[in-house]
């Protein structure tokens, strides 16, 4: 595979890669949290008509069968009741209770358990990556926050209320797809296109052309996210306090400005390392790598809750 291409590793290759990373990083602790990728998970919100004193568990399983694209016997299911907002109105006088449903494919869970055991971690807690991302960026100050996570092949929008996930929206758009667009249009190898994308400077004479090709991959996704945010604010009566942009593909010059234009909101490039201590001379490095480490740091912080 070329630099920047999305890749799916075989089990043995995953084991070797994980062991190598742990060894080279000189990590001494033997505890971990596993952040399950969304590709092996499912997260959604449902609204259930029920009185406040009614047990929702059996109703949630009924609703889960409707929305989860797999048999419930094939997934590990979890759920939590959430409050959409203080200004939420009852629909037609009915008592509606909002529930967040999360499910992980059992076969994926089993594969990753074996991977963790191979690396010496015995039954680490597991959560879906969206929850790690929110933990990594939620400061406790924001009532309502949004996160745009720009990945290799998909870009996700998370909306959180008091640090709890309320909405998620995913679109096929990402850094690897942007590189493919540059490669195809300029008739250059994928590796050369990736190198050009990650090293280009605003002063480069080809920057405008590269940026146009790059941004074309995200235009529709960012417009969709803007619509989802506006619908959420209209439904809940809430105002999104802050929008974080995270993910390894978030650092291309001008992506934050493009997102700001689409969402009509100020954008903060994610820096989860504000939650931990590090030497002052590493400040610039932490800011540069922050968007790529949001999930990892957020997962690690789970052990300190």
Residue locations for each model-derived region?
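Phosphate- and other anionic-substrate recognition elements at nucleic-acid/protein interfaces
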Residues: 10-38, 58-61, 263, 267
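Short glycine-rich phosphate-binding loop at a beta-alpha junction
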Residues: 18, 25-39, 116, 121-125, ...
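Active-site neighborhood for divalent-cation/phosphate handling
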Residues: 35-138, 274-278, 295
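Glycine-rich phosphate-binding/hydrolytic loop that grips phosphoryl groups
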Residues: 132-135, 176, 250, 268-305
């Amino acid at each position: 595979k070329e630099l920047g291409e999305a890749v799916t590793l075989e089990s043995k290759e995953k084991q070797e890669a994980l062991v190598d990373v742990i060894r080279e990083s000189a990590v001494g602790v033997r505890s971990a949290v596993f952040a399950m990728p969304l590709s092996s998970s499912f997260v959604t919100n449902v609204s259930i008509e029920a009185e406040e004193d009614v047990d929702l568990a059996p109703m949630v399983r009924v609703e889960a069968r409707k929305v989860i694209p797999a048999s419930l016997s094939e997934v590990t299911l979890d759920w939590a009741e959430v409050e959409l907002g203080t200004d939420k109105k009852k629909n037609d006088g009915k008592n509606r209770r909002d529930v967040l449903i999360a499910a992980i494919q059992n076969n994926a869970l089993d594969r990753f358990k074996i991977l963790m055991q191979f690396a010496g971690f015995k039954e680490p807690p597991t959560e879906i990556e969206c929850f790690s991302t929110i933990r990594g960026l939620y400061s406790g100050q924001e009532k309502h926050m949004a996160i745009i996570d720009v990945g290799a092949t998909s870009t996700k929008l998370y909306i959180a209320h008091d640090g709890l996930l309320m909405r998620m929206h995913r679109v096929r758009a990402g850094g690897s797809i942007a590189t493919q667009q540059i490669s195809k249009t300029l008739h250059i190898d994928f590796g050369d296109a990736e190198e050009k994308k990650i090293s280009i400077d605003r002063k480069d004479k080809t920057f405008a052309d590269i940026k146009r090709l790059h941004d074309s991959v995200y235009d529709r996704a960012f417009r969709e996210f803007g619509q989802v945010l506006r619908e959420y604010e209209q439904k809940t009566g809430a105002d999104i306090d802050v929008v974080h942009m995270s993910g390894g593909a978030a650092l291309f010059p001008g992506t934050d400005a493009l997102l700001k234009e689409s969402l009509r909101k100020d954008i903060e490039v994610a820096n989860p390392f504000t939650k931990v201590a590090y030497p002052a001379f590493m400040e610039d490095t932490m800011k540069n790598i922050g968007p790529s480490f949001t999930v990892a740091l957020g997962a690690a912080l789970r052990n300190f809750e």
